[in-house]
Structure formats: C-alpha cells, structure tokens
Amino acid sequence: MAKPAKRVAVTGAAGQIAYSLLFRIANGDLLGKDQPVILQLLDLPQAQGAVKGVVMELDDCAFPLLAGVVITDDPKVAFKDADVALLVGARPRSKGMERKDLLSANAEIFTVQGAALNEVASRDVKVLVVGNPANTNAYIAMKSAPDLPKKNFTAMLRLDHNRALSQLAAKSGKPVASIEKLAVWGNHSPTMYPDFRFATAEGESLLKLINDDVWNRDTFIPTVGKRGAAIIEARGLSSAASAANAAIDHVRDWVLGTNGKWVTMGIPSDGSYGIPEDIIYGVPVTCENGEYKRVEGLEIDAFSREKMDGTLAELLEERDGVAHLLKN
C-alpha cells in the first residue's frame, strides 16, 4: 500500500538553489523512493509567476512520487502541516550593505517564518535553514517558535562537510566514500573549522596518512572556508547545485539515518564542547530513527579550541546583533 504523502515546504522557491532542489525532492531523493511528497512552495508576490514556471516543469517531469504542489506567498499556507521545511530564501547581501543590516533584514524574514511554523506546521516538523547567515537565521526561527521543540531547528553545514570530504579525498588519494569521522565545527561562514583529527579512510587514520600540519592550517582550512567565494569568482554565480545537494544529504540522513556514520549539522547547543546553550553550532552527529545525536566526548586540543572559539565569537556577535529583534 502506498504511504501517505509527506508535506515538504520550500521557501525561495523561484531561486537558483530551489531550482536544483525541487526536482530531486520530487524524484524521491529527500525522503526515499517509496515516499510520495506534496511540495508547498513559498516566494514573494513578485516571484509567483516564476514559481508557476518551475511548477510547469515539475509537471512535465511526471514524477510518480509528486502527489501535489501548492504555490503561495503566505508562510501560513506554505507551512501548513509541513513535515519538512527547507528555508532556502533569505535576503542576499547587496553592494554596500553592512553585515548588521543583513542580519536585521533576515531577522525580519525568519521571525515571521518561525512564527508561522509555530502556528501551523506539524509538531514534528524538521526545519533546515539554508539561507545565510544560516546558523543565526535558524536561531531566529527557533526563538520565534516557542511551541515547537528546539531540536527541530537546524542549519546547513553539510556543504562545508562535503567540501572538506572532497579536499581530503584529493589530498589522500582515497575514495571520498571511504572517509569517515570528519567533523565541521561552528558557523556556516569562513570561520568554521573542518577537523579531520578523528577521520579515517578505509580504517586508516587520515591525520597519519596526510601528516602535514602546514597543509591543514594554511591550505585545507582556508580552502574549505572560502570555497563559496572561489566558485563565485570562477563561475560568476553562487554555488546553487552543490548547496541543494547538501540540503538533500542533510535531511535525507536526518530522516533515514546515517548507519552510525558521522555527518555535520548545525544544531541548538546543549552546552557541550563549551558552546553556550541554544547557539546553533555545527557539530558531528549520527542520525537514527528520525533523530540526530551529537557525537560526545571528543578531545579538543589547543588548536581546535582556538578555532572553535573563533567561530563561536562570530555566532555570539550575530546573536547579540539580533537580540533586540526577538521577543524571547
């Protein structure tokens, strides 16, 4: 018997990331090849025509799993009974815009969306914030949805995780699929800290295999941190397809499990690893039965502490920058 359809809300539905994302969701890549989905697409009033065009293309693919599509500019319609909410739309930074202005503009969007999720979404809704600054936008949405469990709100660090995996595979000569136990700590920004001290490839320690502190410090960490900027420089456009792919990976693993493998998610801190409670911070997790669980008890050396504190300082600054815009 066919499963009942799951409702997947996607914001910024007329945008580039959504264009790479929606067809894969409709194809079963997000929730499984036997799980029908209803797409609930949100974008601004002036983008409704463009969303309709995307939906025409979705129709033309005749996806067996696509059980319905809703197009709206009202968050309460988009998030109604949503099982998954992918918050892709955000205010991009325009020329001459200060970071604090960007934070304020996004706080406005994510307080409204958090409140709408609070009011109408499934109580088990899995929320992934992709729109930047993703960690702080997720924090704002979480704080604006007091009736939903905090653990439902996550930010995307999977793109950083996947970028780090590919750099490690290239450096070590090992297949990317063989690399396990990679962690990426902190904010989805150039300050985040990709950490392969615990990583293995085909059972061997990557730290011993690579054995190059200078490469780690001067090449690996900055390359992963600045990869988005490098892609814009090369292509003239931001990394939309790889971001969409990372969003699929993040939610698929959260829903369907990781079989004990580590992945990175930005999740509300419980105070572990010296990160203040509620800060949405990238940590290694495993997923099982629709729940994520942080990897506990990892040793933090002096270099790692410095890196983790550096990215935390940025997150605290962002949090303080939006505090006056939040009710609680």
UniProtKB/Swiss-Prot annotation:
Q: In Gene Ontology terms, what is one molecular function of this protein? A: L-malate dehydrogenase (NAD+) activity
**Example GO BP:** tricarboxylic acid cycle
Q: Where is the active site?
A: 188 (proton acceptor)
Short name of any one Pfam family annotated for the protein = Ldh_1_C
Positions contributing to NAD(+) binding: 12-18, 106, 113, 130-132
Under SUPFAM superfamilies, the record lists: LDH C-terminal domain-like, NAD(P)-binding Rossmann-fold domains
**Which reaction(s) does its UniProt entry say it catalyses?**
(S)-malate + NAD(+) = oxaloacetate + NADH + H(+)
Taxonomically, the superkingdom here is: Bacteria
Keywords, alphabetical:
NAD, Oxidoreductase, Tricarboxylic acid cycle
Q: Could you tell me the EC number(s) of this protein?
A: 1.1.1.37
Q: Which amino acids does the record list as binding substrate?
A: 93, 99, 132, 163
Family assignment from sequence similarity? Belongs to the LDH/MDH superfamily. MDH type 2 family.
- Say what the protein does: Catalyzes the reversible oxidation of malate to oxaloacetate.
Name assigned to this protein: Malate dehydrogenase
- Organism source for this protein? Burkholderia cenocepacia (strain HI2424)
State the taxonomy lineage.
Bacteria, Pseudomonadati, Pseudomonadota, Betaproteobacteria, Burkholderiales
Name of encoding gene: mdh
